[in-house]
């Protein structure tokens, strides 16, 4: 792939092929490769580096020497073992056991001791890295490397397969040992296969041990001694084999071991219950992987500036000395240790943190040569693009894009344009009359165009830059701008891309193309119209991007001899976005293609149904036929369509379809009738009925399947004629061109850059060369944008001086306040208060030192996780404050109250800072950085940014570049998010645009010939032309045209929004009207019910009155009847009493 500098291997594959750690000059030897020896040594070194044991203090110097002896002995044993075993088995599944008696170690001859530990100056942990042996194939640049061994992180894991670093595919069957989980670091052996869907496939995967261990678990369980046999390290899970004596004789000397024999070695890690001492292990023993940004990316070509890494840095030495002082002070003060353990704040900080996200791999790729080169020959092409096939006739190329897009007028992305390639079945609405190969075609000149399709500038920002205000889902799905910028190319065959164009014709295009530039433009318009149907005559600007020259030998073409000549191929880059149809034109085109589909369907329907006139005449005759003709008298293959339909209709079968379908249907029916007769002869009526039922079910199934297939075909054809919603330039490829193999395709810039040596066609070479030049043009433009932004930044020294002045003023004010306080009474209280303040100040300083020391390891990891919150300016100020620490401590004692107040207010300020919403204010600068930072790490290394500035063709000196980089670079990195993003509160602040006048670097300082100056003076007057007797300024007209185009695009966008809003309003109005109708209907029903209820109420009231009157009458009648009953009863009682008296009187008389 061209992006990887002529190598097919991605950057992660070559990332670990660096040389070993540099050694001091006193030793004169180099550390052997750890991975080449054994995975055991690799894991030991990794574990020690992660635990922080490689930081060599005077107290544990002998301890590290002991570990070095063990590592070198095991490495030598593993190297010998690799000579007698298979390579893969020796790399992963070797179980070695190194046991050597004490006498053997003492009687070895004296040789140099290879070790990775410095004997002069202790090195910090961050500088001890794992190096891998450079494969033999890397020494030969002509042979691409097919195999890599590296360490990576498992990013995806499924049931049977997974991915390492998002690129390397592996199956679980290739895993050796413990099955890895997502986020685990693994040792990978991968091979490259370009024919597979995933180019890199892992052959073996092995999980690196000692991951996710608890803080209290020691990394080494058994403390080894110097002279004792080296026991197998059970912690790492890999054993070693016995080592022969001859190998140790070649590596270990008695003289080098003698100093180590005088003292008894102590264990690497003490037990947890022991108190603090010189060999006390660090408090935070957490195995954390090194940040990905610490690893240098692979250069596109072999690096030549390695000496910069060997220069000692005085700042690093000062920070190392300060770290040593802090460590000694901690070891001397056990009380501080106890107070730190009892501090609740430290307990909160020791709580298990959240799972660390996978840091993206640092990937920065750019061309490592000057980008202002106007020409190139075969050797220069071969040097620049090692993967590019160069045709045999090529001898020169002119890069005219340098003049077409100078630094003062760069190319502007963001002009929305898209293409829509139509199916070969769909015909163009307008007839194409362009001629591709005229009879007088001359091969001296060829004109070809590269048509760009690009999203709008707003879409580019959101899809590629991951703006600060975008949601997290959109920021995670970013794409590189090279994937969003696409080109319309022709396809000859399967995978052969070609630029669209053809040869010059004197009769159609005009004579003398060398003097008249419009001749080749006419050639490009004609050939593009003939091949794609796109009319480029609407384009207003034609940029001459490149000229490629071939030396053609004498040949015979179409029966005539063509002498040897030079063929010049001119690649044009027109503003094709002006050919984009407007919204109204797009709607007209959409209706036209739909109408074309309707007409085609009607014509096919007429052809399928036959002549409708004959069908109408024969309708009556078909109805009269009631009995079908006997099957033995019919021959379906010789019958006409009308006869076939009559026979089918008489048999109650479908008569629709083509003639072949009718013949098949009738033939099948006749066979069924023949079978029926045979069955009737056998008198099997029951079976005949069953067969009839089966036949009907089969016919129904066939009819349903036929209808379903017809519906699918209809929908497929309709999709070919339906245009998308967004306007695009319609492409109708000329299917008859290039021997019927021509087609068109839309390919992104990254795909065009992914060429191979196998693409050995001349037209593919032209497309690949254009892609490289276009990519270099974008690199130059984005690099110049970064350069301008660095020029606009203020100098860092001015800011330091202002800060120092402000600090001095603050100190004077505070001293005056203290003098005022001394004049006040209450001396006893002030004295006691001063003593108390001094004690609190000492405690506060101790806590501050502990807090800084304990959070040292956390800062490095948090830098990767919180890169957006990293402030290079503030960190630089912190370094300056550390340099003046003695003076600062004096002022801190006097400013105790201010410090306490600051410590109380600091958490609230941090919370407010976290809550503040960031917003991107400089989107152009962010896109410029993102174009180089392909993995969105958020920073660029200093050496990469320096080389980018050198490639711009500004002829800058090293001092000038260093001065620019000092403004933004911190710890060898430039965190560009601090230059492009800010909080919403600071959004309205205007940027300081005090840009320097000299934006072209040192180009104006170079001597220029007088001829070029005269030509420039002549070209300045070319912009004025005489048209209809008036002088016309072409430049101003073009500017007005661009403005009008922008206004038109904005108006169309607003119109589209208004149409959408109108549609929504119509829908809401329709819904409101429907709801109004329903509510009015309900209202009428409610009124009707109300009137009915009122009538019922009146009726019930009348009935109530009637009932009351009737009851009153009844009551009166009852009262009269009761009175009469009472009177009658009284009369009866009187009569009974009279009778009783009479009877008594009669009895008495008797």
Swiss-Prot record:
Q: Which residues carry this modification: Phosphothreonine?
A: 627, 667, 861
Protein localization: Cytoplasm, Perinuclear region
Which keywords label this protein? Activator, Apoptosis, Cell cycle, Coiled coil, Cytoplasm, Isopeptide bond, Phosphoprotein, Repressor, Transcription, Transcription regulation, Ubl conjugation
Q: SUPFAM superfamilies of this UniProt entry?
A: EF-hand (SSF47473), Nucleic acid-binding proteins (SSF50249), SAP domain (SSF68906)
What superkingdom heads the lineage?
A: Eukaryota
Q: Where is this region: Interaction with GATA1?
A: 643-1150
Q: Where is the composition biased (Acidic residues)?
A: 610-621, 856-889
Q: Which residues carry this modification: Phosphoserine?
A: 456, 685, 697
Which regions are flagged for Basic and acidic residues bias?
293-334, 341-352, 673-687, 694-713, 796-817, 832-855, 890-915
Could you describe the subunit structure of this protein?
Directly interacts with ESR1, NR3C1 and p53/TP53. Interacts (via N-terminus) with CALCOCO1. Interacts with MED1. Interacts with GATA1. Interacts with AR and GATA2.
Query: Any idea what this protein is called?
Result: Cell division cycle and apoptosis regulator protein 1
Natural source organism? Homo sapiens
Q: What is the lineage of its organism?
A: Eukaryota, Metazoa, Chordata, Craniata, Vertebrata
């Amino acid at each position: 792939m061209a992006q990887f500098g002529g190598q097919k291997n991605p950057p992660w594959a070559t990332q670990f092929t660096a040389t070993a750690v540099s050694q001091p000059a006193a030793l004169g030897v180099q550390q052997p490769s750890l991975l080449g020896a054994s995975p055991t040594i690799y894991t030991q070194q990794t574990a020690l580096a992660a635990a922080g044991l490689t930081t060599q203090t005077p107290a544990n110097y002998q301890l590290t020497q002991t570990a070095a002896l063990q590592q070198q002995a095991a490495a030598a044993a593993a190297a010998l073992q690799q000579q007698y075993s298979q390579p893969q088995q020796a790399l992963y599944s070797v179980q070695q056991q190194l046991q050597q008696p004490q006498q053997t170690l003492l009687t070895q001859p004296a040789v140099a001791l290879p070790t990775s530990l410095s004997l002069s100056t202790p090195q910090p942990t961050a500088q001890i890295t794992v190096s891998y042996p450079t494969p033999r194939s890397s020494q030969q640049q002509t042979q691409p490397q097919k195999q890599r061994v590296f360490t990576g992180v498992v990013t995806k894991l499924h049931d049977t397969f997974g991915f390492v670093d998002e690129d390397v595919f592996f199956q679980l069957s290739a895993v050796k040992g413990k099955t890895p989980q997502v986020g685990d670091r693994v040792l990978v052996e991968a091979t490259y296969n370009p024919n597979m869907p995933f180019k890199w496939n892992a052959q073996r995967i092995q999980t690196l041990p000692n991951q996710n261990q608890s803080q209290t678990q020691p990394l080494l369980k058994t403390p080894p001694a110097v002279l004792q046999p080296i026991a197998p390290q059970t912690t790492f899970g890999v054993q070693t084999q016995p080592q022969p004596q001859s190998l140790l004789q070649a590596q270990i000397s008695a003289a080098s071991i003698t100093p180590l024999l005088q003292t008894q070695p102590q264990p690497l890690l003490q037990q947890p219950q022991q108190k603090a001492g010189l060999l006390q292990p660090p408090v935070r023993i957490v195995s954390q992987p090194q940040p990905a940004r610490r690893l240098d990316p692979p250069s596109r070509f072999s690096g030549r500036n390695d000496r910069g890494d060997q220069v000692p840095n005085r700042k690093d030495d000062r920070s190392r000395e300060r770290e040593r002082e802090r460590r000694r002070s901690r070891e001397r003060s056990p009380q501080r240790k106890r107070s730190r353990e009892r501090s609740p704040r430290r307990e909160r900080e020791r709580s298990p943190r959240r799972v660390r996200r996978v840091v993206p791999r640092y990937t920065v790729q750019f061309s490592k040569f000057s980008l202002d080169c106007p020409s190139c020959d075969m050797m220069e092409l071969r040097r620049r693009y090692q993967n590019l096939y160069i045709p045999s006739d090529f001898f020169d190329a002119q890069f005219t894009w340098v003049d077409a897009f100078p630094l003062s007028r760069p190319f502007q992305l963001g002009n929305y344009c898209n293409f829509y390639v139509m199916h070969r079945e769909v015909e163009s609405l307008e007839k194409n009359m362009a001629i591709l190969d005229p009879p007088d075609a001359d091969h001296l000149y060829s004109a070809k165009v590269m048509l760009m399709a690009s999203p709008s500038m707003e879409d580019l920002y959101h899809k590629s830059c991951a703006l600060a205000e975008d949601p997290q889902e959109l920021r995670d799905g970013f794409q590189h701008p090279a994937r969003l910028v696409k080109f319309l190319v022709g396809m000859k065959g399967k995978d052969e891309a070609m630029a669209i164009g053809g040869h010059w014709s004197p009769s159609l295009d005009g004579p003398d193309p060398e003097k008249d530039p419009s001749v080749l433009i006419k050639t490009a318009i004609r050939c593009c119209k003939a091949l794609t149907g796109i009319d480029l005559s609407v384009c207003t600007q034609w940029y001459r991007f490149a000229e490629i020259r071939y030396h053609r030998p004498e040949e015979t073409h179409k029966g005539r001899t063509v002498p040897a000549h030079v063929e010049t191929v001119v690649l044009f880059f027109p503003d094709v976005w002006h050919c984009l149809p407007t919204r109204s034109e797009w709607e007209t085109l959409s209706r036209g293609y739909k109408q074309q589909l309707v007409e085609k369907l009607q014509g096919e329907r007429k052809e399928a149904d036959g002549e409708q006139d004959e069908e109408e005449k024969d309708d009556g005759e078909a109805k009269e036929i009631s009995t079908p003709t006997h099957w033995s008298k019919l021959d379906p293959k010789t019958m006409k369509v009308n006869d076939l339909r009559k026979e089918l209709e008489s048999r109650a079968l479908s008569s629709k379809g083509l003639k072949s379908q009718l013949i098949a249907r009738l033939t099948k029916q006749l066979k069924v009738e023949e079978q029926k007769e045979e069955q009737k002869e056998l008198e099997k009526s029951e079976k005949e009925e069953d067969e009839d039922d089966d036949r009907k079910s089969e016919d129904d199934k066939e009819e349903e399947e036929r209808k379903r297939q017809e519906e699918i075909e209809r929908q497929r054809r309709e999709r070919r004629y339906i245009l998308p919603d967004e306007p695009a330039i319609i492409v109708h490829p000329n299917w008859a061109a290039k021997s019927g193999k021509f087609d068109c395709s839309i390919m992104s810039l990254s795909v065009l850059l992914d060429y191979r040596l196998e693409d050995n066609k001349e037209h593919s070479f032209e497309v690949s060369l254009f892609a490289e030049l276009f990519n270099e043009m974008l690199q130059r433009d984005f690099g110049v944008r970064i350069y301008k932004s660095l020029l606009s930044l203020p100098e860092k020294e001015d800011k330091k001086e202002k800060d120092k002045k402000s600090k001095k003023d603050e100190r004077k004010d505070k001293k005056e306040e203290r003098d005022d306080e001394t004049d006040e009474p209450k001396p006893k209280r002030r004295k006691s208060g001063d003593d108390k303040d001094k004690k609190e100040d000492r405690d506060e300083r101790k806590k501050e030192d502990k807090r800084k020391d304990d959070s040292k390891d956390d800062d490095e990891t948090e830098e990767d996780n919180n890169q957006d919150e990293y402030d290079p300016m503030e960190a630089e100020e912190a370094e300056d404050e550390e340099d003046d620490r003695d003076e600062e401590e004096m002022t801190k004692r006097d400013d105790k109250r201010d410090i306490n107040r600051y410590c109380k207010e600091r958490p609230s300020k941090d919370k407010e800072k976290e809550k503040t919403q960031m917003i991107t204010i400089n989107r152009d600068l962010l896109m410029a950085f993102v174009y180089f930072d392909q993995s969105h790490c958020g920073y660029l290394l200093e050496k990469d940014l320096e080389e980018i500035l050198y490639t711009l063709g500004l002829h800058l000196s090293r001092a000038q570049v260093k001065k620019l980089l000092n403004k933004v670079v911190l710890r060898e990195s430039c965190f560009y998010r601090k230059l492009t993003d800010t909080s919403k509160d600071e959004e309205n602040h205007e940027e300081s645009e005090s840009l320097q006048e000299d934006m072209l670097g040192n180009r104006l300082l170079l001597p220029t010939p007088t001829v070029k100056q005269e030509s420039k003076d002549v070209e300045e007057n070319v912009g004025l032309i005489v048209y209809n007797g008036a002088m016309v300024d072409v430049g101003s007209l073009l500017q007005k045209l661009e403005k009008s185009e922008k206004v038109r695009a904005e108006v169309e966008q607003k119109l589209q929004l208004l149409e959408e809003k109108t549609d929504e309003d119509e829908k809401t109005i329709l819904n409101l009207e429907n709801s109004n109708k329903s509510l009015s209907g309900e209202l009428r029903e409610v009124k009707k019910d109300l009137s009915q209820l009122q009538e019922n109420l009146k009726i019930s009231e009348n009935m109530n009155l009637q009932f009351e009157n009737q009851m009153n009458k009844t009551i009166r009648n009852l009262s009269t009847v009761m009175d009469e009953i009472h009177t009658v009863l009284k009369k009866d009682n009187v009569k009974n009493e009279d009778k009783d008296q009479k009877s008594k009187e009669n009895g008495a008389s008797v």
